[in-house]
């Protein structure tokens, strides 16, 4: 049987990662755990110190992984691993966030904006539906400021942004490969583009339950705000709501197109060499900045530049636009991406030996790991594992035939459970940072985890009982 170029490249990379992961010691995961502990605890006990010394903490924990790794495997191998992480994962991650942050910051709403339970439910529903078509990050950046602005008159607002993260930043992105990077990787491995629409019943089930819970929570908070004499500041009743900076939707479309291209170009023969590897600029060892990734970065940066050049500063002023949120995310996540490498390598090397062969097992394994690790490689590990189980009926992919129920479970686990923590998906921490900047007192890392355990985990248990058993 002939093996395609993409299959050859995937097999080569998988074997290389397996070799590394099998030699990896769990002790190398300590810096990742330490960094997560800092993110969770220090804002509570040493907030001012943490605010001033975040970069130093990132450097400390990153070096605590890199230096021992270099001692054991050699400086060249350590440098290659860090460079590979930065080029393959972090670069496109932060450029995408940056581009969407810039473009969305140049769009604002004006008029009679008063957040109420019904209006908030409607806005969360709109954002959730947008997530699958412009990405969870795109929808989050587009909707976060309008929702904050509409509820600015209220005292009790943190629950609104928590459910925003649940629905818009995560669960809503399950219907297309544009929605969330794991599904884009599935598309690159042979899953049809519109296959994810099969997940609509699961999405509808989750959205109905969570929006119902949210409505009653928000109604209670709303009544308390009104009872305390708070009311929306509407100076001109009847003023029509309108959008300023609407032309920036063109630049948003450019960014979405860049993401789609990054997922489709690597599979084209023009972007592959004779061995099936994606062409690009060789940097060091086996690290290459691929041409599809470079094209994505250039398009996004051009979109961000044009957005700023064509939009009035007054719109950004009305949005209270600052660079603080993107700076915080950029600093924290470079450390997270570097220190999580040992955990990902171990997972990739041992995923097939976990003994998972049922949809509900795949759902929880993929989801729990996606809550703390990058959900894209986690998705690929379990998709590869499922494809190697030898099933003959189901969805044919280049990794093997995967039963439809198992593919649905892996997809939902990766997309939905990124909502469990602030670091589970790209937009989560960004939404938190923007909310904090706008005076909303967001839960701490553990506080947010309590919200997800209280409201999300019961819903995911219902998902398992209804869809994956």
Model features per residue range: what roles?
Residues 156, 175-176, 194-240, 416-469:
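Juxtamembrane and boundary regions of transmembrane helices in multi-pass small-molecule transporters
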Residues 84-96, 195-213, 282-301, 364-370, ...:
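Alpha-helical transmembrane segments
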Residues 196-310, 466:
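Core mid-bundle transmembrane helix pairs that form the ion/substrate translocation pathway
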Residues 68-70, 131, 141-156, 160-162, ...:
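Membrane-interfacial helix-loop connectors
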Residues 6, 14, 44-48, 66-89, ...:
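Transmembrane alpha-helix boundary signature
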Residues 28-39, 53-70, 90-99, 244-254, ...:
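Hydrophobic mid-bilayer segments of alpha-helices in multi-pass membrane transport proteins
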Residues 254-389:
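Transmembrane helical segments that form the transport core of multi-pass membrane transport proteins
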Residues 15-28, 49-58, 79-91, 193-202, ...:
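Interfacial loop-to-helix junctions that mark the boundaries of transmembrane helices
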